[in-house]
Each structure stands twice: as structure tokens, then as C-alpha cells.
A protein has these predicted regions:
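Start-transfer (signal-anchor) and selected internal transmembrane alpha helices
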Residues: 1-39, 248-253
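Membrane-helix interfacial "entry" motifs
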Residues: 6-18, 87-88, 115-123, 148, ...
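Membrane-embedded helix bundles of polyisoprenyl
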Residues: 26, 126, 131-143, 148-234, ...
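Membrane-interface coil-to-helix junctions
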Residues: 30-133, 157, 161-169, 173-179
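Transmembrane helix-loop junctions in multipass membrane proteins, especially transporters and channels
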Residues: 41-42, 115, 195, 231-239
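Intrinsic-disorder/low-complexity, polar/charged segments
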Residues: 48-49, 104, 148, 178, ...
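Transmembrane catalytic cores of multi-pass membrane glycosyltransferases
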Residues: 50, 57, 61-68, 216-229, ...
């Protein structure tokens, strides 16, 4: 009984240790990478797609959400505006914002943030997405029986602070969403294959689907490939026996 208890406590202890170590290491690495912005009081919004598209959509979504809440509290009616002539020559709001903001749970915070502080919240959330990506990668490593906390921490930092990761922080922040969801989807597949409940997989599929349809089909494709690979590796002995049986059957026929 004591051996079983110690076996259960070890992953929890390693998980807490990883969380603290990774959080501290991420703060240090983020400060080293972006200290120039902090010193010069600059945001992480680049003057191209980041400013014209993503940040504009972030601010618009916050204003859009506040207007819905104001209407709800003042008139006690839930009114969802669906068309805005200020978007180009006029466009559907939900269709336009779905690619940029609507669906990402973190962007809901823009509703509670005044427009004058939106740039700071936008920059903070951009880094927070990378932080979550490292956590999800670490969780996947633990399910693969990798219990070396320091190694997983280093791997998570490498996964996050790549050229791609540092590029998307200022250019396309929501490009970090696949980095968060993919390890969780693969983790969900591993849990289902181990006979555990599929709650994590279901929730991750739901969040990935509503966050961005463009990345969702890519995530679905890679998850399917990983699932096939997992099944092939897990039932390799069955395939070997089937091959031997097939060869013996052909030998008997001849």
C-alpha cells in the first residue's frame, strides 16, 4: 500500500517541481529576450500585420463585447450585432473576427480592458500563450514516462523560444495556439489508448475548433498521423504474427 502511494505521489511531486522550475526559467528567458522592449517602454506589436490586423481585431473585439454587455444590462436584451459597415466596405462581424479573436478564450479578457491599456494586455497575452505552450509540452513529456524534470524544463524552453515562437509573439500571436493544443491532443490520444477517460481530448478538440478553423484541420491531420503511428507501434507484435501466419499459409498452398 505504501509503495502504491509513493508511486502516485512521485508524478505529482515532479509535476509541481516542473511547474515552478519552468515558470521561473520562462520569466528569466522572456526578460532576457525582450528586455529592450521593457527598457524602452515598447509593446510587442509590430507595425505590420500585428498592428493592422491582430491588434485592431483585439481592440474591436473588446469594444464589441462591452457593447453587448451594456445593452444586456441597460435594456435586459441580448443583442448580438452581426454587421458593421466600418469593416472594409461592410462585413460580417463574426465571420471576420473568428479568424483573429473570437474563439480564443484569452481574448475574452479584452472585454474587461479599456482601449487605452489594450496594447499592454495584448503584449502580455502574447507571451502568456508561449508560456502555456511550454506547459502543454511538458505535460506531454510526463505522460511519455520522462521523469527528469530538468530535461523536460529545458525541452519546454527550447520548444517555446525557437525562431518561430519569438517571431509570432509580435507578428501573429494566435499562431501560438497550435503550439498549445497539439501536445494536449497527443496527450489525449495517449490517455485514450491507455484506457483512460477522454475528457482532455474532448475539451482540447472543442477549444481548438472554436479558436481557429484554419489551424484546426492541420491539428486534426497531425493528430490522426500520430494516432496511426501509436497504433502501429503498440500492436507491432500482432502485425508480426499476422505476417508470419500469412507467409506460412502461402507456403502450405504451394
Amino acid at each position: 500500500m505504501s509503495d502504491k502511494t509513493s508511486t502516485l505521489k512521485k508524478p505529482i511531486k515532479n509535476g509541481k517541481k516542473f511547474f515552478l522550475l519552468y515558470s521561473a526559467a520562462f520569466l528569466v528567458c522572456a526578460a532576457l529576450c525582450y528586455f529592450w522592449f521593457i527598457i524602452n517602454k515598447k509593446t510587442l506589436i509590430i507595425n505590420s500585420d500585428g498592428w493592422r490586423q491582430h491588434f485592431a481585431a483585439f481592440v474591436y473585439f473588446g469594444k464589441y463585447g462591452r457593447e453587448i454587455l451594456e445593452t444586456l444590462f441597460e435594456t435586459h436584451k441580448f443583442v448580438l450585432p452581426q454587421w458593421d459597415f466600418s469593416i472594409g466596405l461592410g462585413s460580417d462581424i463574426l465571420t471576420t473576427l473568428h479568424f483573429y479573436a473570437i474563439g480564443d478564450p484569452l481574448d475574452l479578457l479584452s472585454i474587461a480592458c479599456p482601449a487605452k491599456y489594450a496594447a499592454y494586455l495584448y503584449s502580455l497575452l502574447s507571451l502568456f500563450r508561449l508560456y502555456l505552450a511550454g506547459l502543454s509540452f511538458g505535460a506531454f513529456c510526463f505522460i511519455k514516462k520522462q521523469n527528469h524534470v530538468s530535461s523536460i524544463t529545458v525541452g519546454s524552453l527550447v520548444y517555446v523560444f525557437t525562431l518561430f515562437g519569438m517571431f509570432i509573439v509580435s507578428h501573429h500571436p494566435f499562431f501560438a495556439l497550435p503550439m498549445i493544443f497539439l501536445p494536449l491532443l497527443l496527450l489525449g490520444v495517449e490517455q485514450i489508448a491507455a484506457g483512460k477517460r477522454p475528457y482532455l481530448f474532448i475539451v482540447t478538440v472543442f477549444l481548438a475548433a472554436i479558436s481557429n478553423f484554419y489551424f484546426f484541420y492541420m491539428l486534426a491531420l497531425f493528430t490522426a498521423i500520430y494516432t496511426l503511428f501509436l497504433l502501429v507501434c503498440r500492436y507491432r507484435h500482432v502485425q508480426k504474427r499476422l505476417l508470419e501466419f500469412s507467409l506460412k499459409s502461402q507456403a502450405v498452398q504451394f
